[in-house]
């Protein structure tokens, strides 16, 4: 069962669960996997799985550098940045940012899909969102069928315009 695949069950009123320390006595012969290298935690920012808002990009972003405008918008919205499988396959973003059937399944209040065509596998990962805003230059993109709101146009113009309006709203 994938995390966030189903809504959380209501509590039974018994209060928080008790945490019990457990340290099994194992040696290397008990382990099916051996750790050959420890990598520093590369995850930064807000967790995709826990985010209330996710700003996600697809092939339409154009390049790794194209994610800069999405990161700027995400910063203003206290959002996580996600992406489609095509983006991780191209090496533009790490796999930890991938939303979809083979990535993270998300259920934010708002999912902003920028330049994402909307493959079935991607929709499987974001269909738990309460609202989906799709920004796409293709008026026939499959993601539009799943979107609550859509803006058809160039995301390199639309995303900065949204960011500018949000900044104006925060000025004293």
Q: Residues of each region from the PLM?
A:
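N-terminal glycine-rich FAD/FM-binding segment characteristic of electron-transfer flavoproteins
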Residues: 1-172
């Amino acid at each position: 069962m994938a995390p966030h695949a189903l809504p959380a069950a209501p509590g039974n009123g018994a209060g928080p669960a008790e945490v019990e320390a457990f340290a099994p006595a194992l040696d290397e012969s008990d382990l099916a996997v051996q750790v050959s290298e420890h990598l520093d935690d590369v995850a930064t920012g807000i967790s995709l799985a826990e985010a209330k808002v996710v700003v996600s990009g697809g092939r339409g972003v154009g390049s790794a550098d194209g994610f800069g405008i999405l990161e700027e918008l995400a910063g203003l919205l206290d959002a996580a940045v996600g992406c489609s499988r095509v983006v991780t396959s191209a090496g533009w973003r790490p796999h930890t940012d991938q939303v979809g059937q083979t990535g993270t399944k998300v259920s934010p209040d708002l999912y902003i899909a920028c330049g994402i065509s909307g493959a079935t596998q991607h929709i499987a990962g974001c269909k738990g969102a309460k609202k989906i805003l799709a920004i796409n230059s293709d008026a026939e993109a499959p993601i539009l069928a799943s979107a609550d709101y859509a803006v058809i146009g160039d995301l390199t113009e639309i995303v900065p315009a949204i960011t500018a309006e949000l900044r104006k709203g925060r000025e004293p």
